From Swiss-Prot:
<keyword id="KW-0732">Signal</keyword>
<keyword id="KW-0547">Nucleotide-binding</keyword>
<protein>
    <recommendedName>
        <fullName>Torsin-2A</fullName>
    </recommendedName>
</protein>
<dbReference type="InterPro" id="IPR027417">
    <property type="entry name" value="P-loop_NTPase"/>
</dbReference>
<feature type="glycosylation site" description="N-linked (GlcNAc...) asparagine">
    <location>
        <position position="149"/>
    </location>
</feature>
<dbReference type="InterPro" id="IPR049337">
    <property type="entry name" value="TOR1A_C"/>
</dbReference>
<dbReference type="GO" id="GO:0042802">
    <property type="term" value="F:identical protein binding"/>
</dbReference>
<dbReference type="InterPro" id="IPR003593">
    <property type="entry name" value="AAA+_ATPase"/>
</dbReference>
<dbReference type="GO" id="GO:0016887">
    <property type="term" value="F:ATP hydrolysis activity"/>
</dbReference>
<dbReference type="Pfam" id="PF21376">
    <property type="entry name" value="TOR1A_C"/>
</dbReference>
<dbReference type="GO" id="GO:0005788">
    <property type="term" value="C:endoplasmic reticulum lumen"/>
</dbReference>
<dbReference type="InterPro" id="IPR001270">
    <property type="entry name" value="ClpA/B"/>
</dbReference>
<dbReference type="InterPro" id="IPR017378">
    <property type="entry name" value="Torsin_1/2"/>
</dbReference>
<dbReference type="GO" id="GO:0005524">
    <property type="term" value="F:ATP binding"/>
</dbReference>
<dbReference type="InterPro" id="IPR010448">
    <property type="entry name" value="Torsin"/>
</dbReference>
<keyword id="KW-0067">ATP-binding</keyword>
<comment type="subunit">
    <text>Homohexamer. Interacts with TOR1AIP1.</text>
</comment>
Length: 321
């Protein structure tokens, strides 16, 4: 999916994941100290909610629930000068449906430096927590990193990708940071944002969307109330999910479970047109059709949903140009 700058204009490719180091204190400086002590200091937190809303409307295909939930949650959180707890969102859905895209947009439209901001922290289990046998060290390092950076600046964003692959038990150390009473050394952690991303629940979301289509219901009629229980059950029943045995879901520390619906052919077409525009190219029917023809759809009988969402659109366009 194409991305956009502040003001909802096209922008360049996103940076890779930020590295994790074990001692966050080494990154602190006098500016961070002043930020900690200043009651009104927001570091480089510069929210542009109209820009975010515009970008989601133009570029996020087929996700009426995700758009509404994310915008509503952020508006309420950002406009509250004294939130009662951090904002905690859990994004769920099939591959290529826009979860990582939305999380990158949040970083871009909330912080002046986007993903480059020192207040945005992106964690991947493959890069940062690859060895389950090192779980105790990972716990210590993660807790130190989160606590240290929140002490430096309460306005911080923590992105946890591929929760399906997180070492079991690791997320337990985050539980104290996600509630409404975690204050350490005079620093209030309630202005932080935590976002968790996973494919868990994707099959269940797909099934609900398929049943709606078979019943001739418009996909925009699908309600959160239909999806939230099946997603929560899928997470709780998965012993390999990062939330397993963490108490995060059981204690209702999530502010919103955000479902991403599977993408149909016209949604993939939308992604192709967006990507061509991102490349500065005019839409070419033969390229659009070639990408659609090379995309696998499921179920076998209906051929309704893209197997990879829009994940491979950019590489397919490059092949057919």
């Amino acid at each position: 999916m194409a991305a956009a700058t502040r003001g909802c204009r096209p922008w360049g490719s996103l940076l890779g994941l930020l590295g994790l180091v074990s001692a966050a204190a080494a990154a602190w400086d006098l500016a961070s100290l002043r930020c900690t002590l200043g009651a009104f200091c927001e570091c480089d937190f510069r929210p542009d909610l109209p820009g975010l809303e515009c970008d989601l409307a133009q570029h996020l295909a087929g996700q009426h629930l995700a758009k509404a939930l994310v915008v509503k949650a952020l508006k309420a959180f950002v406009r509250d000068p004294a939130p009662t707890k951090p904002l905690v969102l859990s994004l769920h859905g099939w591959t290529g449906t826009g979860k990582s895209y939305v999380s990158s947009l949040l970083a871009h439209y909330l912080f002046q430096g986007g993903l480059r901001s020192p207040r945005v922290h992106h964690f991947s289990p493959v890069l940062h927590f690859p060895h389950p046998s090192h779980i105790e060290r990972y716990k210590k390092d993660l807790k130190s990193w989160v606590q240290g950076n929140l002490t430096a600046c309460g306005r911080s964003l923590f992105l946890f990708d591929e929760m399906d692959k997180m070492p079991p038990g690791l997320m337990e150390v985050l539980r104290p940071f996600l509630g409404s009473s975690w204050v350490v050394y005079g620093t209030n952690y309630r202005k932080a944002i935590f976002i968790f991303i996973s494919n868990t629940g994707g099959k269940q979301i797909n099934q609900v969307a398929l049943e709606a289509w078979r019943s001739r219901r418009d996909r925009e009629e699908i309600l959160l109330q239909e999806l939230e229980p099946v997603i929560s059950r899928a997470v709780l029943d998965n012993p390999h999910h990062g939330f397993s045995n963490s108490g995060i879901m059981e204690e209702r520390l999530l502010d919103a479970v955000v479902p991403f619906l599977p993408l149909q052919r016209h949604h993939v077409r939308h992604c192709v047109l967006n990507e061509l525009a991102q490349l500065g190219l005019e839409p070419r029917d033969e390229v659009v059709q070639a990408v659609l023809d090379s995309t696998t759809f499921f179920p076998e009988d209906e051929q309704l949903f893209s197997s990879n969402g829009c994940k491979t659109v950019a590489s397919r366009i490059a092949f057919f140009l």
